């Protein structure tokens, strides 16, 4: 059995296959995922698992050099923005319109669906390198 915190086999595989500048998205239960993009559906109930639980777990495994968030999170979900910044205080953030973020999912290796039910709880993680 794996010793690390990430025990979901699909998430482990996707993260292991990622290289520098590759992207992975984590989002709320309502985010539409483009056809052809792998969706790893973890949602089991309202808020289970939460966006922050999944993000925290992924950050145990993935080196992240930049994150992308919807511009709307600033006004529509400032608490979630505060939580993300607290978890990743040194990581640069690029804000974009939510409509552009949905289009950018086409450039992600996978989308991880959580049980989160709060608006604009979506992130794109850009992979860094560990050396």
Swiss-Prot record:
It is an enzyme of class 5 (isomerase). Pfam families: RbsD_FucU. It is found in: Cytoplasm. GO terms for molecular function: D-ribose pyranase activity; intramolecular lyase activity; monosaccharide binding. The active site is at 20 (proton donor). Substrate binds at residues 28, 98, 120-122. It comes from the Bacteria. It catalyses: beta-D-ribopyranose = beta-D-ribofuranose. Homodecamer. Belongs to the RbsD / FucU family. RbsD subfamily. This is D-ribose pyranase. It comes from Pediococcus pentosaceus (strain ATCC 25745 / CCUG 21536 / LMG 10740 / 183-1w).
């Amino acid at each position: 059995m794996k010793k690390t915190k990430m025990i979901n086999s699909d998430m482990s595989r996707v993260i292991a296959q990622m290289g520098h500048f590759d992207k992975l998205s984590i989002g709320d239960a309502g985010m539409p995922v483009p056809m052809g993009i792998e969706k790893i559906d973890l949602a089991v109930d309202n808020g289970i698992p939460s966006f922050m639980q999944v993000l925290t777990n992924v950050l145990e495994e993935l080196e992240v050099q930049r994150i992308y968030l919807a511009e709307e999170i600033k006004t529509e979900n400032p608490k979630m923005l505060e939580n993300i910044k607290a978890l990743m205080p040194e990581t640069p953030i690029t804000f974009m319109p939510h409509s552009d973020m949905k289009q950018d999912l086409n450039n992600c290796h996978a989308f991880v669906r959580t049980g989160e039910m709060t608006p604009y709880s979506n992130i794109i993680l850009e992979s860094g390198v560990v050396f």
